[in-house]
Amino acid sequence: MTDKSKKSKKLKTQYGSVRYSNFINKAIQLYGCQYTYGEYINMTTRMMIICNQCRDVMYETPKNHLHQKAICQKCHKIPDKPKKYLINTKQKYLEQFAKIYGEKFDFSQFDYQGYYEDAEIICNNCKQKQTFTIRKLLNGTKCSFCAER
């Protein structure tokens, strides 16, 4: 290896480490200690990101992670603002459910805790309580007891 290529490689490594420290500093400002980060290559190459709360693993580019206010899909919470975020999300989902189901289900027992968590609803036809994930409700589910949709 020539002196020039050694010098070039050293500069790239130093540049990359500066970029990594900038990325980490910005990520900590946005998310606190919510995530642990895998190997950093550059801002546009996907890296492993681990949620420290639920230990779920996601792969995201550092650029998207910083600019899209990424949230863990498993626990679906934003650090430092969970209650406000959950309230806003609950209202958003209730509005969507009203459009999808109209009066077919009673959502008064609905308590949003996360996208993949079960939510309790009541069928207005047979009055049976049942639980579904948010995802299943958004896809248009039927009552498990009377098949009312």
Curated annotation (Swiss-Prot):
Recorded superkingdom? Viruses
The name this protein carries in UniProt is: Uncharacterized protein R667
- The source organism is Acanthamoeba polyphaga mimivirus (APMV)
